[in-house]
Amino acid sequence: MAKGGREKIKLESTAGTGHFYTTTKNKKTMPEKMEISKFDPKARKHVMYKETKLK
């Protein structure tokens, strides 16, 4: 059985609301930290989300 090459990560809002998304990413194809614009329901607008470690 092959091991999964994907790692669970947490995308945390830069707006300071404490909102976060969880997702997975392939460490071999994307070794750098992920930054993506997503909707923050607490701020009620699109903001940048940065990757942090999932505890």
Curated annotation (Swiss-Prot):
SUPFAM superfamilies in the cross-refs: Zn-binding ribosomal proteins (SSF57829)
Ranges of compositional bias, category Basic and acidic residues: 1-11
Record keywords: Ribonucleoprotein, Ribosomal protein
Bias (Polar residues): 14-24
Gene Ontology CC, one term: cytosolic large ribosomal subunit
Source organism superkingdom: Bacteria
PROSITE patterns: RIBOSOMAL_L33
Pfam family, one: Ribosomal_L33
A molecular function (GO) term: structural constituent of ribosome
InterPro entries tied to this protein: Ribosomal_bL33, Ribosomal_bL33_CS, Ribosomal_bL33_sf, Ribosomal_zn-bd
One Gene Ontology term from the biological process aspect of the record: translation
Region Disordered, annotated ranges: 1-29
NCBIfam families the UniProt entry points to: PRK00595.1 (NF001860), rpmG_bact (TIGR01023)
Protein name, per record: Large ribosomal subunit protein bL33
Species in which this protein is naturally found: Thiobacillus denitrificans (strain ATCC 25259 / T1)
Gene name of the record: rpmG
